[in-house]
Amino acid sequence: MDQSELVEAVSEAGGAAVAPVDLRKELEEFLKRLNIETTCIEHPEVFTVEEMMPHVSHLSGVVTKNLFLKDKKRRVFLVCVRHDRPLALGELSRRLGAPNLRLAEERLLLEKLRVRQGCVTPLALFLDTERSVTAVLDRELTHGGHTHIHCHPMTNSATMGITPADLLRFLEETQHTPVILSFD
């Protein structure tokens, strides 16, 4: 299914469709080619971090909150922070030099990363072959001494763990040099 078919399918379904299983499989194959080992747990479909936490609170490492944002200039950002991190968009906008930073509409998310709201993940960046999405990472994720970073594997009915070093290598392989910011 190409990007336009996915956008059309989600539109026709009234937004009820979730990222197809084949995208998760595609991600897993990509990670395997990079020799990146992950852990994965299945859970009911969740749409917020609050809904997800009862299913993942037992995992060692850090759980992410992921936001797909755009600015006034139509630049797009995938912001990944620790799950309980408060995020002030005005301050983030200033730090990134991104005027009027706000949540991007789901259609743009589907066009760029082929996932729906509730499924946003840094792992979707392997599909951004145009490299039009800027990855922004909370320094706590990569330099906080965590064994794993937990995020969705293209679907909001599972959570995947990846080491901080492997996430950085994944981003390097997808040619997404992350902007790493301290939010403390």
From Swiss-Prot:
InterPro entries: ProX/PRXD1, YbaK/aa-tRNA-synt-asso_dom_sf, YbaK/aa-tRNA-synth-assoc-dom. Coiled coil: none annotated. It comes from the Eukaryota. Pfam families: tRNA_edit. GO terms for molecular function: aminoacyl-tRNA deacylase activity. Gene3D superfamilies: YbaK/aminoacyl-tRNA synthetase-associated domain. This is Prolyl-tRNA synthetase associated domain-containing protein 1.
